[in-house]
A protein has these predicted regions:
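Short, well-formed alpha-helical segments that are part of the catalytic scaffolds
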Residues: 1-11
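Glycine-rich, basic loop-to-helix element that forms the pyrophosphate-binding segment
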Residues: 49-66
Length: 259
């Protein structure tokens, strides 16, 4: 969290923001010492969500407290790379036809973690170009191009507050997986565009903050969320992502041809 906040405070060219931190069952003493330190700042609030982990509910809880016209959902395991990132996202999000803007996210080893989401990857949905070099242009330069997509990850997602309220936030039935994709699809269904902007760039040290899907309970919950996604968006899964060529494979994220 400190690395995330420091990167924004030190680098961001856009300055008119507040931090809303949602604390959910941390146990480390240094975490609470850090909260005490940053709560002295005028633009920081720490909220305490004491129930079991539910990514959708936690984000809804925090967003309800936000004062701004735009809300940036941002995981604590991120770090700003490009100083203009927030400005870049805001420039696109201010368009009246846009509801959501996502960013280019980079793994610690300088490969791509997220350059948009494609519906159908791996049977449900997955990140485009994951694992490719951060400087690759990608298929038809899609890694480096601002473009409309079906979905982006909520690890770094800007949404207009009025649109967030219109679709009633994230669906809390999706506790961990697919909540961001469901949210983007709801926003598209309401008539707004979802846009990927690669000029906004963050590192994403993924799953460091929450662990992996490794227990029987977690696997069962994941399967349940796959089923729920299929119930809600089965027609889209059947017909395919409108932003993805049906001649390309769904088995890999590199936009290669079907075999």
């Amino acid at each position: 969290l400190k690395k995330c906040m420091d990167s924004i405070e030190e680098k961001s060219t856009y300055r008119n923001f507040e931090f809303i931190i949602v604390e959910n069952n941390s146990t480390e003493e240094e975490t609470f010492a850090y909260y005490k330190e940053i709560e002295k700042r005028d633009n920081v609030r720490v909220l305490y969500y004491k129930e079991d982990f539910n990514y959708s509910r936690i984000n809804n809880f925090g967003a309800k407290e936000a004062n701004g016209e735009y809300v940036l959902l941002l995981n604590n395991d991120t770090e700003m790379i490009e100083p203009d990132s927030i400005k870049e996202m805001l420039d696109v999000c201010m368009r009246p036809d846009v509801g959501i803007v996502g960013a280019k996210l980079i793994f610690e080893d300088n490969t791509i973690q997220h350059a948009g989401v494609i519906i159908g990857f791996g049977g449900v949905a997955g990140h485009a170009f994951i694992g490719q070099d951060r400087d690759d242009n990608g298929y038809f330069s899609r890694i480096i191009s601002v473009q409309d997509l079906s979905a982006v990850t909520a690890a770094c997602l800007m949404v207009r507050r009025s649109v967030f309220d219109e679709v009633e936030g994230l669906n809390e039935e999706f506790k961990v997986a697919f909540n961001d994709i469901d949210f983007c699809l709801k926003v598209r269904k309401a008539g707004y565009l979802v846009v990927y902007n690669p000029y906004a760039q963050f590192y994403h040290y993924e799953s460091k903050s929450r662990g992996q899907e490794d227990s029987a309970d977690k696997v069962a919950r994941f399967q349940q969320e796959i089923g729920l996604f299929g119930e809600r968006w089965g027609e889209l899964l059947e017909h395919g992502d409108p932003y993805y060529n049906p001649n390309l494979t769904l088995d890999k994220a590199d936009f290669s041809l079907k075999e």
